[in-house]
Amino acid sequence: MSKIYQIKINSRTYDEWYYTDLLQNKVNVSYDPINYKLFNNDIVMEVLCDTSNTAIQTPRIKVVDSIISKNKNIPGVLILKDNKTYGRLERKDTLDLSGSAIKKTPGKLLYKCIPDDKTLPPFLIPYEFKHSNFSKLYSNLYVTFSFSKWNDKHPIGTLTNVIGEVNNSNIDIYYSYQLLCKNLNISIEQFNKTLFNNIKTRFDSSTIDLNKITNEFVLSQYPELENRTDQKEWNIFTIDSVNTTDYDDAFSIKKIGSSESCETYMLSIYISNVALWMELFGLWDAFSSRVSSIYLPDKKITMLPTIMSSNLCSLIENAYRYAFTMDITISVINYDSTNEKDIMIENIEFTNTIINVSNNYSYQQDCLFLNPNYKTLFNITKLLSEKYVCQYDITDSNHMVAYLMILMNYYCAKNLKKNNTGILLKNNITTMPKGAGLHNESDNFIKSWYLSKSEYFGVMNKIDTTSNSPHISNHESLQLDAYTHITSPIRRIVDLLNLVEMQQIHDLFAFSKEARQFYNKWTSEDHILFINTNMKSIRKLQNECTLLDMFNNIPEIIEKTFNGVIIDIKNNIGSNNTTVYMVYVPELKITCKITKQTTKNYELYNQIKCKLYMFPDEYNIKQKIRLEEVVDV
């Protein structure tokens, strides 16, 4: 019986490799992948071959499946800078009309191409300059290519696309290349097309006219939803960055009772109900594989079509919009003798509403401070943060919004966990020690960072409600027994999925069969793995691009020494005993890794001195920016 293995290659030099069986168990197989021209993750089968002049059969292997060989768009850098070539592609015969060869035509020159995938060897790719360059100063190119053959030392590839020159001054090209490298260049063309067609069908029109989606239209589609469109009764407002167009969340605060020693308020958090728009225009089957919007320094790549993210789903002022709403009934107790206040959450309810936002404010905007409802909301939120969910230092509107998002994410997570459904975040958060000596701003950032980098898991697949399952999240640093994401459904698929499920368990809306199929598909284990992988790639891409943009716009930061805080530690025992430190630099509001061999034992939340350095990297960009520790001599 033939044996099947998978090859695992750890570097492009092929100096570290091993084989596994199909269950990913290591096996003692010694076929040299260079001799057999194998790529990382190739599936091979062991076969017996007759040896010449003997009756002995010798075991050999042949490739039965190869992801790399089938990939038509492998990203890499074509090395043209020094005009170094590696021979030519085979010569081709030119035929006359009778079919007879009349002369030999030289093939294109071969240039080295370095794949972005560090497990792949250098390729040779035929390339011909389109225009003469008398200065002979060529730039390396970001390209994609496909595998052609591998007969000699280097595999041969075929160019499929030229993205642009490797040049720090053309950052857009670098962004496009990185999207390809991290498999994030996912099209939403079909999503857009379906949306446009369904809108035109709905209004029996040959063109898209968003003016037809009036407030009256929004109100008429789901008349059973609670109507909160009267701006005199409901002062609902958003608070976001000044350039925001996709308003996910909004707030209102109403006094609903008072006595001599107590005042009662209803604090409402409104989240754009993207799911109702998906249902209204029949878009569940058209959703792409984008799991999140991507925010780059100069552009935004949205998860949803722009018509949805910046218009229909966005909580724009003076426009009727669907909102999933959390109403919190709060009692504020006044102590006359000490002039102190205490706060109690009396009740939390979830409902669907149609809202009419009064104002789209930006953080710390002057007119925001003139709104008496904002002042009340700020003071009540500050009291809540001292007692409920987590200690969060609130000194401005940005902190207030961040805390209210944590609050809603937490209470929705408790609901989902109680009902054994939804998507939660895994427990990989370490307790924040008291007296760590961190500034409150750093404390807030670290709490938010831990939540954003946690991995998701499907509750149905992981939680045993009859026992204390080790899979149940326990976010100790935030004093949380569960946590999820639901407050950003315009930009994150997990939030959209949890939004659907929260409405389901509270009987707020009867979704279609297509919606349930969408939910079941994306909460399967393989799709949650896909979400986690892509979210990690997106965070890495955004961080790298932010660093590069910062260097281009503020080059003097390279000369400066910064204070950093260690917020995560990982020991790589199998990699020369190196330690990877994740460091937060408060002054720059960025996180960077420092990888080093060290005898010094750092602990979480230790503060260190660090600098940004540039390293040459001809295979990626002209300078790679890394954070390094500054060691006092």
Model-derived features with residue positions:
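Charge-lined substrate channels and their catalytic hotspots, especially those that engage the 3′ end
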Residues: 1-271, 275-319, 396, 597-598, ...
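Asparagine-rich low-complexity intrinsically disordered tracts
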Residues: 10, 24, 31, 82-83, ...
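Feature marking long nucleic-acid-engaging regions of large polymerase/nuclease enzymes
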Residues: 17, 28-31, 127-130, 145, ...
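Structured C-terminal cores of nucleic-acid metabolism proteins
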Residues: 26, 411, 429-430, 437-633
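A broad structural signal for short, well-ordered beta-strand segments within beta-sheet-rich domains
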Residues: 63-64, 159, 336-345, 538
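Short beta-strand micro-motifs in enzyme catalytic cores
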Residues: 109-111, 324, 579-581
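Intrinsically disordered, low-complexity acidic/polar segments
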Residues: 154, 168-169, 278, 335-337, ...
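Generic detector of well-ordered alpha-helical segments enriched in charged/polar residues
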Residues: 160, 174, 178, 196-200, ...
